[in-house]
Amino acid sequence: MTATEATASPAVQQAAAKAGRERFASRLGFILISAGCAIGLGNVWRFPYITGQYGGAAFVLLYLLFLVILGLPVMVMEFAVGRASQKSSALAFDTLQPSRRWHWFSWWGFIGCLILMMFYTTVGGWMLSYVVKMGTGAFNGLDAAGSAEVFGAMLANPGELIGWMLAVCVIGFLVCSMGLQKGVERITKVMMTCLLLVMVVLVVRSLTLPGAQAGIEFYLIPDFGKLFAGETVSEQWATFGNAVYAAMGQAFFTLSLGISAMEVFGSYIGKDRSLTGEAVRICGLDTGVALLAGLIIFPACFAFGVNPGEGPSLVFVTLPIVFNQMPLGQLWGALFFLFMSFAALSTIIAVFENLISFVMDKWGLDRKTAVVRMAVTVVVLSLPCALGYNVLSGVSIPAIGDIQSIEDFIVSNNMLPLGSLLYLVFCISRKGWGWEKFLAEADAGQGLKFPAWSLPWLKWGIPALIIVIFVMGYAPKVALWLGLA
């Protein structure tokens, strides 16, 4: 079997050309947009915290291991499916394997992206809101209680949350309406460049604060003892198990794999570069942003004696107080939330493009019509989350939480791991696309090749890890539901 036969057939390629499939204008655009999709809020409010908790650089090494053996292969598979088919997930599986009933899987990614946007647009709106709040001095003179009150007041105001959610949707869909090259690629390249520049400025400011050294040591100096913290041997191994699970989860979830978020970008590129090399660059950029976020947060928190927590409370309650204590704190705080806004919007624009491409391929719509229909759909579906902190605050599920937590649980604990498993089966199984065809597509072009010797690991190792992630995500919740915890 030749490389040409093993990838997309000439008929598929000719059909794509006749259909006028849009293309990225540059390789840099593809890398930055794919990285922008991966770089999200978890890079800021989760990765730095668990890195410090489990031994700094010791945990980073563990994380990088799982990024390479778990996240990277699945990312290459998503890119390969997109590039070989020259279609979004709406038609990719039928194009590559028309004799099997893989077409139902196309809806998995579409629904997953929709649910992701149901809460991500609201949280992205928080970032825009805080750029304004920090810039106008809303936190001046406030202590931790006052900062928490500002955050609570925002959540309790449905009009404010809906307004900022609408602003995020308008920005995202407006960019997508301008087209792939003139809109999505051009704007995202500018936004990602600004994100990196703002991060560098904030890192320099944070590292030069008096007392920042303690935060740097906590974050980066390897402490393998923290990987085995505990009084007894069983406690020590339990800590190590938690660290391994945290590393696996972070490596897996940070890339948003399994809902075809990356697949569509593969359909916009040619075959001049191998996909493994491109995926390595994207993962490296995503990891770099996460590491830089820690260099902003920990030195600043330690410099002012503030305990760095995890999650939204770190970003929306703790950090405004830290910025308050800095000279020119309003400026640094506004820049930080501008960086956070760019991180959120880069993901939102990328996923919006995925949704738009899906309906364009599925129903033959032009871009403008697809944008309007998806904009209305996303806004309507985002309302429950925006109202979930106030009008619908009584809606919750035990062990999961409010509406936003429920939506996040559906995507993160279910659709991402199971979707990744399905991509894996499709790419290596004879009943799917097949290993030889996938490998030929992944290796087409110059650059790093996908290791052919890794097939046994793909067959047995990755499925086992994905099942562990899936089960571990449910274990504490099931224990609570059964009254065992």
Language-model features, listed with the residues they occupy:
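Membrane-interface "cap" regions at the ends of multi-pass membrane proteins
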Residues: 1-45, 74-79, 83-96, 100-107, ...
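Membrane-embedded translocation segments of transport machinery
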Residues: 2-24, 185, 189-345, 349, ...
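Inter-helical loop and helix-membrane interface segments of multi-pass membrane transporters/permeases
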Residues: 18-21, 50-54, 89-108, 121-181, ...
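Select transmembrane alpha-helical segments in multipass membrane proteins
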Residues: 23-34, 59-62, 101-114, 162-168, ...
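Transmembrane helix-boundary motif of multi-pass solute transporters/channels
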Residues: 28-66, 260-263, 277-280, 284, ...
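Membrane-water interface regions at transmembrane-helix termini and the short interhelical loops
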Residues: 50-54, 80, 101-117, 152, ...
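Hydrophobic alpha-helical segments of multi-pass membrane transport proteins
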Residues: 344-350, 371-389, 405-440
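A generic transmembrane alpha-helix motif of multi-pass inner-membrane proteins
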Residues: 401-425, 447-485
